[in-house]
Amino acid sequence: MIDRLEKIQEKYLRISEELNSAKDPSSLKSLYKERSRLTPLYLKVEEYLKIYKDKKDAEELIPSEKDEEMHSMLKEEIRRASKKLEELEKELEILLLTPDPNSGKNILVEIRAGTGGEEAGLFVADLFRMYSKFADKQKIKSEIIDSAPTGIGGLKEIIFALEDERAYDLFKFEGGTHRVQRIPSTESGGRIHTSAVTVAVLPEADEEEIEINENDLRIDVYRSSGAGGQHVNTTDSAVRITHIPTGVVVACQDEKSQHKNKAKALRILSARILEKQTEDKKQASDAIKKQMIGSGDRSERVRTYNFPQGRCTDHRIGFTSHNLSAIMEGDLEELIGALTEEDRARKISETQVH
């Protein structure tokens, strides 16, 4: 283990040296980001290695130490050092976890109505409200990118951006199918209906990650339509972009300006292409899949919201809250904390420090 920790020291110091000589803005940005990520680990490694050295020095002195009091002091020093090293090993286990490559990124969140007709559309709007309230509490900037209203207060689909370095880590477990059980306001017999919506969390691509060639795009423009399909604009402001190499298609009609819709569509396109690339890599690596709490796939059932019982259950970790009303108001800290801890515990069990 000492060799591994010394290599971390060397890497950190090498990056610091490279920062002093780097002049290219993109290299500087990348180096600063990497050093910032490594700093907490480097400081903990420094502390561990110092205590480890002190313990070794004390162990070497004990055989030749004749003074009984000094012998006793050295043994006590070794005992304290051993205890502290055990504590530091646990902290290092967490810090040594392979960082998620998407950590620190802005994200796009896409919520779509699934089975359940109008009820599903209403729940899309409810989930968007829940996420918006949680983002507000966390002081995370949000922006609607595109939406498709149903006309009765619901949404067929909504895509919104969350811009903050904590956004991905806080929302990464939200991807999948969210099921809702409740009595619709139009239901006179009091029967509980079950409907579902799907959530996708798409990390936004950095410029260096995705390079889109204009020649690979087919761009179509058309008139935007509102609820019920009626045209809401007299000009061709809506934009549909097809990325020919991957077959990824996105459309945006939220803005009145074709230029703004194109910019938003390109933003979604970059995130979708990155998602496709990530999924391809995941399928090629069973090890990555095993490390995750759920796959984040749209088809995976992740959570049930039971309104008659006031209960919310996350099926991946068996977490149940009987305070559904608070959760729908954006109180997601306990739930997200439980998911984060479970994910961390699983990863630590596979990456022991020895």
UniProtKB/Swiss-Prot annotation:
Q: Which residues carry this modification: N5-methylglutamine?
A: 230
Query: What is one cellular component GO term in this UniProt entry?
Result: cytoplasm
Question: What does the entry's PTM section describe?
Answer: Methylated by PrmC. Methylation increases the termination efficiency of RF1.
Q: Where is this region: Disordered?
A: 282-301
The principal location of this protein is: cytoplasm
* GO MF term set: translation release factor activity, codon specific
Kindly list the residue ranges recorded as spanning the membrane. none
What PROSITE patterns would the database entry show?
RF_PROK_I
Any Pfam family from its record, for instance, is: RF-1
Compartment(s) of residence: Cytoplasm
Keywords, comma-separated and alphabetical: Cytoplasm, Methylation, Protein biosynthesis
Q: Which domain of life is it from?
A: Bacteria
What is this protein's function? Peptide chain release factor 1 directs the termination of translation in response to the peptide chain termination codons UAG and UAA.
Q: Which family does it belong to?
A: Belongs to the prokaryotic/mitochondrial release factor family.
Which protein is depicted? Peptide chain release factor 1
Organism of origin is Leptospira borgpetersenii serovar Hardjo-bovis (strain JB197)
GN (gene name): prfA
